[in-house]
Amino acid sequence: MNIWAPAPEPPTKLGRHRQLAPGCGLHVSPIQLGAMSIGDKWHPYGMGTMDKEASFKLLDAFYNAGGNFIDTANVYQDETSEEFIGEWMEARGNRDQMVVATKYSLVYKRGASFEEIPQKTQYVGNSLKSMHISVHDSLRKLRTSYIDIFYVHFWDYTCTIEEVMNGLHNLVAQGKVLYLGVSDTPAWVVSKANNYARMAGKTPFVIYEGEWNITMRDMERDIIPMCIHEGMAIAPWNVLCAGKIRTDAEEERRLKSGEGGRTLLQFDGWLRNETERKVSKALEKVAEEIGAKSITSVAIAYLMQKFPYVFPIVGGRKVEHLYANLEALDISLSPEQMQFLNDTVPFNKGFPYLLFGDGSDYNIVHKAAGHYDKWPAQQAIRPQK
C-alpha cells in the first residue's frame, strides 16, 4: 500500500475544501452553513426555528456532504444556536474537524428578562469587557476550548481600534481564538485596524462578513476592494435575499398553503417586491440556459464567481434545500451571463469611481496618454469537472 495514497473522493463538491484567504492557511468548505435558524427561540419574531432533533439532522447532512464551515453568533436564537452546535459536535466527536465562526457585540442576553438580568449594558458593544464575557460564554456553549474564527459583529463607534485589536490579539495569544473576522463594519475602520495590527505586532482580520447579494451590491463599492487589498476572505450573508429569491410558482404555492416566509427584519413583509421579482426572473432565465434545477443555486454561483475567496453563508432549515443549494458548486456562468445578471439591478459606484474608474481598467486620463496591456486580476475558482 502507498502511505501517501490519495484521499477518497468526497461525497459532494462541498468536500473539496479551499484556502480561506491569502493571509490565512485554514482550509474550509466552499459554502458555509449559516446557523441563525439553528435553535428554538426566535419563532415569535418571524424567524424560522429548529428544535434540537431537526438541528442535528441539518448539521449531520452538512457534515456528511463534506461541509466543515459553520457560521453562528452569540446572539442567534437567544444563544441556543451555539448550544445546539456545541452539543452536536460533542455527540459526534468531530470538533477538530469543524471550523466554527462565532461573533460578539450584539446584546446576546436580550432573551433574558430584566428580572433575570436587571443590567445588560455589559453584554453589548465592542468593549473589552463585552468581548471577555462573550468569548467565555461562547466557549462554554460550544463545548470547546477554542473558537476557529471570532468576529466583531458590528462596529459600535465607542471603542478605539487599539482597545478592540489588543483585546482580540490577547485571545489569540491565549489560544482561545485562532483567527479574527469582522462583520458589518466600514472599510476604512477595517483597513485602519489591520494596519494598526501589523504595525503593532498584533493579529489582523482575515475575513469580512457582510450583506451582499444580486440585489444589494454595496459591498462592491469599497469593502470588497478592501478585502482584496488586505488579503481577506469574503463571507456574504443574506445571499438569497431573506428567501425572496423564488419563482412565481413557489410564491403562489406559499400563498395557497399559508406557509409564508421569513419576516424577521423584513419590514415590507415576506412577499417579493418588484426588484426581487425581476431578479428572480433573470435567475430563472439563466437557470434554463444552463440546465440548473434551482434559481437559488444560480444566485449563489453568481457571487462565488465574481471574486476569489468568497464563501457564501447559506442557512435554512430543510435538508432538501441544503442539497439543492449545493448545485451552485456545479454551475459555471459565462461572462455574458454574469453581465446579464449584473445589469438586472444596475449598480452605481458613485464618486470618485465614476470619474476616474475603479482600477479594473486604465482610466480616461491614462488612455489619453497612450495604450496599455493590463495584467488580469485573480479569478475565482471554477467548478471541477
UniProtKB/Swiss-Prot annotation:
Its EC number is 1.1.1.91. One of its GO terms (biological process) is catabolic process. This is Aryl-alcohol dehydrogenase [NADP(+)]. The N-terminus is blocked. PANTHER family: ARYL-ALCOHOL DEHYDROGENASE AAD10-RELATED, NADH-SPECIFIC METHYLGLYOXAL REDUCTASE-RELATED. NADP(+) binds at residues 238-248. It catalyses: an aromatic primary alcohol + NADP(+) = an aromatic aldehyde + NADPH + H(+). The active site is at 76 (proton donor). Belongs to the aldo/keto reductase family. Aldo/keto reductase 2 subfamily. The keyword Transmembrane does not apply. Keywords: Aromatic hydrocarbons catabolism, NADP, Oxidoreductase. One of its GO terms (molecular function) is aryl-alcohol dehydrogenase (NADP+) activity. The keyword NADP applies. Transmembrane segments: none annotated.
